[in-house]
């Protein structure tokens, strides 16, 4: 199962992504969690305080695999570098979860064809197409950073929103992107919700997006406390229990595809 989690910055993508990873692990799955955000914080959601150097900053590996130094243009380098062993080489293990921090490509802008971008994109494609583990991608708000074709074969795209107009606008953009890419399974998670607002939000999302709401994750002070302290959320918390319902939906989807 390959899942991309998207949405506007600050809506809680990383919290939801990390909780889903833990639920998959709890139920016996091996998981690869990929932090695709230029400001990587996925490891913090697991209580990892030590710095994990993003792959985009591992100049030694980039040069070893592509034959060219990062930041170089016009040079000859491999466009199909070996990536199948990189998960073991650069991944950070937490039980049966392996975290992979991709980092950002600062040179060349969108769509740059440079050694770092070639390596990162090829690795993402490998994770989605070749690996047997559950792969969960914690994406940035706009995935153009890695190129649209990197995620066109995911099994499910989850769009996380909060009760704001800005996040709804981003959700519309992500829905269009998913449709353009031919991603068939698409759902919405509404985060930071008050119980009394659920029906109103459900109606608005149906009208504005035409998508199914897979879950309403409540505003939960335990989430705020855990994020402030840099500790994983208690899986018995109100928010985690709602995410567990979403997990159960994903398992049903997995068993029918």
UniProtKB/Swiss-Prot annotation:
Disulfide bonds: none annotated. Keywords: ATP-binding, Nucleotide-binding. This is Uncharacterized ATP-binding protein MJ0823. One of its GO terms (cellular component) is cytoplasmic side of plasma membrane. ATP binds at residues 7-14. To M.jannaschii MJ0084 and MJ0685. InterPro entries: CobQ/CobB/MinD/ParA_Nub-bd_dom, CooC, P-loop_NTPase, ParA/MinD_ATPase. The keyword ATP-binding applies. It comes from Methanocaldococcus jannaschii (strain ATCC 43067 / DSM 2661 / JAL-1 / JCM 10045 / NBRC 100440) (Methanococcus jannaschii). GO terms for molecular function: ATP binding; ATP hydrolysis activity. The keyword Nucleotide-binding applies. The lineage of its organism: Archaea, Methanobacteriati, Methanobacteriota, Methanomada group, Methanococci. PANTHER family: SEPTUM SITE-DETERMINING PROTEIN MIND HOMOLOG, CHLOROPLASTIC, SEPTUM SITE-DETERMINING PROTEIN MIND HOMOLOG, CHLOROPLASTIC-RELATED. It holds the Pfam family CbiA.
